[in-house]
Structure formats: C-alpha cells, structure tokens
Regions:
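Mid-to-C-terminal catalytic subdomains of enzymes
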Residues: 325-330, 334-355, 362-473
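Peripheral terminal appendages
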Residues: 157-159, 200-201, 209-224, 439-527
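Short, amphipathic alpha-helical segments that act as regulatory/interfacial helices
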Residues: 6, 100, 104, 314-320, ...
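Short coil/turn segments at secondary-structure boundaries
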Residues: 33-36, 112-116, 167-172, 219-224, ...
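Hydrophobic (often cysteine-bearing) scaffold residues that line and stabilize catalytic clefts
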Residues: 13, 92-95, 114, 199-206, ...
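Amphipathic alpha-helical segments that form well-ordered structural scaffolds
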Residues: 98, 209, 269, 394, ...
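Cysteine-centered catalytic environments shared across enzyme families
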Residues: 1-300, 322, 326
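ATP-dependent adenylate-handling ligase core
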Residues: 258-316, 322, 339-353, 373, ...
Length: 527
C-alpha cells in the first residue's frame, strides 16, 4: 500500500505539497518524497512490497514522462521480460516500473489490458497531457478536486485534499482521465453474454479461477499473512493459499471478549490447514476509544462500513504493532458476487443480477473502502482474491438463475466448487453466513448503539440530524458517525452515495438497519 499525490499547478510550494502528502504517511512509511516537474508536483509515500531496494522509489521517469502508482501489477515479471526483449531497460524490481514502457507501447489502451489493482497518475511528455486511471473495481483508492486556481489535483485519500480543493470527488473505477475528460474503459459489472453451462462446468471454472486469483496474490517480496474470520470467504482464501504454498501460513482472527462468535470457527480452520494462528481479543472500551480514529481513516459515515471496520481496524493494528507483515489477503467481494442474506429475497433471477451489478459498481464506497483504509491506516496492503478481474467477469456472466438461492443454502455455487477438494472442514464449507460486524460478537454493535443513544437526548438528535439534507441521519448511531465524519471532512458527504442497506423494494427487506440480524431469514447465522 502506498500513497500518491499529484497537483497540476505550481501556485503552491513544494513544502506545502509535502505537508499534504504526509497526511497519509501511514500508507507509505518506508519513504516519502515530492518531486517538482514541468507541469506541477508528484508525491509518493512508499510501502515497499515488490522490489524492496531504494531503486523502487517513485515517481518513475522515462524520457521526460513521469508516473506514480499505488498498485500491484499481476504478471509483471512476464510483462517486464517481454519489454526487455523490445529494448526497454529497468532500474528496479518494482512492478509499477513497467507502466511507462507499457504506455509507450499501447497508449491509453494500456488500462483496459492491465491485470492489476491500481490507482496511477502519468504525465505524457510528448503530448503534454496529464493522465490518471483507476482499476475496474476501485480496490485502490483515488480522489480528485480542483484548487482555487482551477488546477486539478489527485490523491490516494480524501484527507490529502481537504482544505485546498473545492470539493473532494471520488475518481470513478474502471476509468481514466485524459485531456480534462473522464473515460470509462470498462464496466466490470456489465455482462456481454451469459454462461449457460451445467453446474459441474460452472463450479469447476469458479474453483480454478478463484484458485488462480489467490495464487497471483501470493507473489510478494515482503512478508504476507491472512485475515481469517472463520466465515466461508476468508476460510476459502486461507485454505487455497495453504494448499498452494504447502507450508504453514500466518492467520489472524479477532473477536469481542464477551461473545465472540467466529473465533472458534477461525481456530478450527487454522488447525485444519496447519496455520500459525493468532487470536486478537477486543473490548468494548477499545471499540469506543477507536471509533473516531476509524471514521477519520475511513472517510465515511456509512453505518455498516463503520461497524464492520471496528474489528478489522483493531486486528490490523495488532498485526502492525506485533509482526513484520506488510501484506494481508482478505475475503471481500464474495458477497457482492454470490449474494448476501438479503438477496435470498430477490424476486427474480434478473433482479438478483441487477442487484449484484449495483453492488459491484459501488464496492469502492463500502467493503473495498473498508479493506483498504483499515489496512492502510496500519501500514498494511490489502489483496482481495475475490476481486480478481477474470474471476469477477466470469461469475457476473454466470446465468443468474443458477446464482439464486434455490438450493436451501446461500453461495451454493462457491461452496459446491470446493466440495471435493477437502481443503476445509465440511461444517465450515456449508456454514451459514454471518456478517463480520456481528460475527466478532453481537455485543459490539449493541455497544455502539447504546453509546450513541446515551450521547444524544431525543431533542438533540432531532435538531442535529436536520442540519443534513444529504444522507440525513435516521438513528442516533448514524448521527454520531455523521458528526465525527463532518469534523474531519466538512461538507464532503457526497463522497458516499448513500447508506448501505438491503434492497428495500424487495419483500422482506424493508428494514432500517443494515445488519442481516434484522432479516426474517437470519436463522442460524451468527451461531
């Protein structure tokens, strides 16, 4: 994980830009620098993952052109070898050094061909144009805004831009900026033809593509570990990785000191795959003391994002403080592809598919945002195998009638895909889903709600919530989060499109809390 900063103007000093960059030093604690160029400034804070020597420090320059990138370019060694055969030379082992040669070869077409999680800014010396781009899902963050002089600025996080741009805007995923315009190079959720193969063929493809997605993300020069909740998704990632590596992996789980639900399942998985497992216990006091820090790191007021981030932030904090790890593989993006508890209520296959596409397109505002910020705030890099582009494209193209829960078990295709591998205990593979914010302990969400209820009187709540026209708070908990958000990001609420909620237009989903606990089909989930 790194931090990038670009300003296409020179009406500020280099020292001022250095100050803006240092607001996200935790993203790149290994080295930081701001370079003045012919068009403005480029800043980079480095967390060394590939090519650990100083030669891998950015920006990279070639024939007057520049690039900065927070990303992982998968398969870069093969790309690098091909470029070397064409006469290109490289100074480092960094994967991102291939970007300028790739741009010279393919121009703007480069972005649609990258197998990567990335956010980058590139200056083309020949055309004098500034270019920025972001991966199709938005796994790596990127924001932009305009200074008082009308010059554009780009940054990894909103906090880099607060106070000196007019409005902090989210850079759209799957897009590039060129010559003052944003161009969509791929809508990853769009389907150009459905797969109507039988279940056995579909599940084999799911198996093989997810396995390859995990394998790609095991490539790192820095030490890596795994977040293991004990739920299906993170357990699969860990089990696949352990099977590939044929050696013990390092896994980490977190739970409340009072009623942790998932810790026993995480330990069962860790023991089964032979992992070096660490449990982190959190308390009510730690959750409440960390709340403001977490909201500042997230730059959101969304209820479910914040709830789910409390455990993730605290386990990552422990990993940062007590280990040498720099990379963590996580289980995000499975729900959006295969379904949440609430998608059991989808009225039709078409409705399920439409909802999945919506969730994939909004990932960068919610689950992917959470994974990035909770890890980056603790100088760790998130890698998300379920976000592998080939995997996402395939699952989105599977006939939605086969993805509907008509099997009596959610995520049936994913479970079935690994049924014969025996890399997980059967009870884990077929366990009911529980939301992470609930699975760390039901008491955590209850503690947050109770704290908010006591924080405001009913009169204060009614008065304060009316201050906000956009995404108006509707509970004391949501008001508390919004007030903390506004303290650090005043007037920037539109960075978040809305509160994450189940599809209220569906029967059984018209609820006022994002937790699956309020759904009629929760059943044995979270037990």
């Amino acid at each position: 994980m790194c931090s990038i900063l670009c300003y296409a103007g020179k009406d500020v000093t280099k020292e001022t830009m250095e100050g803006y960059l240092l607001k996200t030093k935790m993203r790149g604690p290994d080295a930081q620098q701001v370079v003045e160029t012919e068009f403005g400034y480029l800043g980079f804070a480095r967390l060394a993952i590939m090519g650990l020597t100083p030669d891998g420090m950015q920006p990279f320059q070639r024939d007057g052109s520049w690039v900065i990138c927070n990303g992982e370019i998968y398969g870069f060694r093969k790309i690098k070898k091909e470029l070397e055969e064409r006469g290109y030379q490289f100074q480092s082992g960094s994967d991102c050094e291939v970007l300028l040669p790739l741009y010279e070869e393919y121009g703007l077409e480069m972005f649609s061909h990258l197998d990567a999680e990335y956010a980058c800014v590139l200056y083309d010396h020949k055309s004098g144009k500034l270019i920025a781009a972001r991966d199709q899902i938005g796994i790596r963050p990127l924001f932009y805004g305009y200074s008082k002089s009308g010059k554009i600025a780009f940054a990894s996080e909103a906090k880099n831009l607060i106070g000196w741009v007019d409005e902090v805007r989210t850079f759209p995923p799957g897009s590039y900026y060129y010559d003052g315009k944003f161009v969509k190079y791929e809508d990853i959720a769009a389907v150009h033809g459905y797969v109507h193969e039988d279940i056995d063929v579909i599940t084999k493809n799911i198996h093989d593509k997810l396995t390859e997605g995990v394998k790609k993300r095991l490539d790192a020069d820095a030490p890596l570990g795994f977040l293991l909740s004990g739920g299906l998704d993170s357990s699969l990632v860990c089990a696949i990785a352990a099977d590939i590596l044929k050696k013990p992996i390092r896994t980490f789980a977190i739970g409340m000191d009072t009623d942790a639900i998932d810790l026993k399942y995480a330990k069962e998985v860790a023991d089964f795959i032979g992992a070096e497992h660490t449990e982190v216990i959190m308390t009510k006091e730690e959750v409440l003391e960390s709340l403001e820090t977490v909201i500042e790191a997230l730059a959101t007021y969304d209820i479910t994002t914040i709830r789910a981030s409390m455990g993730m932030y605290l386990v990552c904090k422990a990993i940062h403080e007590k280990t040498d790890l720099k990379v963590l593989l996580t289980g995000e993006i499975s729900d959006e592809l295969f379904g949440y508890k609430y998608t059991d209520f989808a009225p039709s296959a078409a409705a399920f598919q439409e909802e999945a596409a919506k969730r994939i397109r909004e990932l960068y505002c919610y689950d992917v945002l959470r994974a990035d910020r909770c890890l980056a705030a603790n100088s760790l890099e998130a890698r998300v195998p379920f976000g592998d582009l080939d995997f996402v494209r395939y699952v989105m193209s599977v006939d939605p009638a086969k993805k509907l829960n008509t099997y009596g078990k959610g995520k049936y295709l994913l479970r079935k895909a690994f049924e014969t591998d025996h890399i997980l205990p059967e009870n884990i593979l077929w366990r009911e889903k529980a939301a992470f914010s609930d699975a760390v302990g039901h008491s955590m969400v209850d503690d947050l709600k109770e704290y908010a209820e006591k924080y405001y009187t009913d009169e204060e709540y009614e008065t304060l919530r009316r201050k906000y026209d956009f995404a108006q708070p509707f509970t004391k908990e949501s008001l508390l989060y919004r007030e903390i958000f506004e303290k650090y990001y005043p007037g920037q609420a539109r960075m978040v499109p809305d509160f994450w909620m189940p599809n209220k237009s569906w029967e059984g989903c018209n609820v006022n809390d994002p937790s699956a606990r309020v759904l009629a089909n929760y059943g044995d989930s979270g037990k």
